[in-house]
Amino acid sequence: MKLFEYESKKILSDYDIPVPKGYILSDISQLKNNMNPLVVKAQVLTGGRYKKGLVKFYDNSLQAREPIIDLLNQTFEGEKIQTILVEEMIKIKNSYYLSFYIDRDLGKILIIFSEEGGVDIENIRKEKISIEYLDPYVGLSNFIYKNITSYKTP
């Protein structure tokens, strides 16, 4: 199952995990003037959106208006962009990469974590990435949780 970023953030928020304030829109008439500065993120099921010009930063909503219209009129990798996530811009102290992938052959969930998050997880050296398997019937054990959260790069 693939989730859009806004769907993932809704799940995190439901479990009281802080996420930036934001909202989704599918039409420019839904653009609000309550966030300055802001981040505009096209919601497509692909990685590398920033490098592909699908994540942009603006000082105010007026500045973001035309680019949002352009994004909503784009097709990306054969799929029309239908939804935009608009979020408050926050100062980033640290950036991490965390991914959960279902390994159907093993019947387990693969957790991939790196303290070098951000744009190019594919280009991070292997020794900077922590990989653990999670048995869905056991859950996130303390061992795995400690391994991932205390992971330090060499």
Regions found by a protein language model. Give the residues of each.
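Glycine-rich phosphate-binding loop of ATP-grasp-fold ATP-dependent ligases
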Residues: 20-22, 40-67, 97, 119-126
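A long amphipathic alpha-helix within ATP-dependent nucleotide-binding catalytic cores
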Residues: 141-154
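General structural feature for long, well-ordered alpha-helical segments within catalytic domains
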Residues: 4-11, 63-67, 140-144
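Hydrophobic alpha-helical hairpins/lids featuring a short glycine-rich hinge
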Residues: 78-136
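Catalytic core of tubulin tyrosine ligase-like
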Residues: 15, 64-66, 70-77
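Short beta-strand-to-loop capping motifs
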Residues: 26, 57-60, 88, 100-102
